[in-house]
């Protein structure tokens, strides 16, 4: 059993993996990013890659779960190690007995921006990508993901209304049941699924309905950006007039300062107006982020603030 303090200290955890010869690791993508950084620091301390390889890990499989994977964050891993360790991305939810799909990743996946590849179904499950009328959507078209099969739970304990809303009759299989995930997905031409985020992550700002993932995908293209998250924050929070360029990991909680390039909307008397805030890790310049957003996104999708973090704030179990 790994001591709690070790699990929360990436350098100590990586040292343990090497010392014990661990071959299979299951982590959240955020925790794995911290582990990658610890490995890079260890290699630098060793002096060169050849010496570092003597104390390298023996991982054969790394399995991701618990949160959405941004494939581009694995580019440095593939650059250092190639494909000798099989990386696997899994998608799942509690209501379907956790695991639903798996995707054996390749180095080329790290070159893709935006969507997270979640692969193909576990054999005893059925997957459907449906539109608002619960009709199958064509390949490449975004829809909501529904899951059927042996893993679907009976429902929520003592919550009959929510059970009726989320667990529905399967219109394609007599006597079957489906779970309405609330997740957006689309089929790729190679038969694999892509995860596109939550349908409730669409926010409405100044009358426009916005998909936050589209903004993140554009900002991720900027050189020097390692990871990026865009949130809709209440304008009623404290606002200043200068650009925020750096913050500590706990900055996701307090309100950041705004950019002078895009003014925050004024809160209404009945409900606070939302504004977009981009948080990122890496060494990208805020001006480059603003320019990318202004060039490729409509004005209502341009974040009003940009906050650089040294590292993502993680929960005790490694989630963002």
Predicted regions and their residues:
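AMP-dependent adenylate-forming
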Residues: 86-89, 103-254, 261, 267-320
């Amino acid at each position: 059993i790994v001591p709690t303090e070790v699990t929360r200290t990436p350098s100590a955890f990586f040292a343990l993996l090497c010392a014990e010869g661990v071959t299979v690791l299951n982590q959240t993508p955020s925790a794995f990013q911290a582990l990658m950084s610890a490995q890079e620091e260890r290699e630098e301390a060793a002096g060169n890659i050849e010496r570092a390889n003597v104390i390298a890990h023996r991982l054969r499989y790394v399995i991701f779960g618990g949160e959405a994977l941004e494939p581009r964050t694995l580019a440095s891993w593939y650059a250092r190690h190639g494909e000798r360790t099989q990386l696997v991305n899994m998608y799942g939810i509690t209501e379907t007995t956790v695991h639903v799909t798996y995707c054996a990743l390749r180095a080329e996946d790290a070159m893709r921006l935006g969507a997270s590849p979640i692969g193909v179904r576990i054999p005893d499950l059925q997957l459907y990508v449906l539109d608002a009328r619960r009709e199958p959507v064509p390949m490449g078209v975004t829809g909501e993901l529904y899951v059927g099969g042996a893993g679907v739970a009976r429902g929520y304990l003592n919550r009959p209304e929510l059970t009726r809303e989320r667990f529905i009759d399967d219109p394609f299989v007599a006597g079957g049941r489906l779970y309405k995930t609330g997740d957006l997905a689309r089929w790729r031409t190679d038969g694999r699924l892509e995860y596109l985020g939550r349908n409730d992550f669409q926010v409405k700002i100044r009358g426009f309905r916005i998909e936050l993932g589209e903004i993140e995908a554009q900002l991720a293209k900027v050189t020097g950006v390692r990871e990026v998250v865009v949130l809709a924050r209440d304008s009623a929070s404290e606002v200043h007039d200068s650009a925020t360029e750096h913050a500590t990991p706990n900055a996701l909680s307090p309100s950041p300062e705004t950019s002078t390039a895009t003014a925050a909307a004024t809160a209404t008397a009945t409900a606070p107006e939302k504004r977009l805030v981009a948080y990122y890790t890496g060494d990208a310049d805020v001006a480059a982020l603003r320019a990318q957003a202004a060039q490729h996104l409509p004005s209502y999708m341009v974040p009003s603030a940009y906050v650089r973090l040294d590292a993502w704030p993680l929960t005790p179990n490694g989630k963002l």
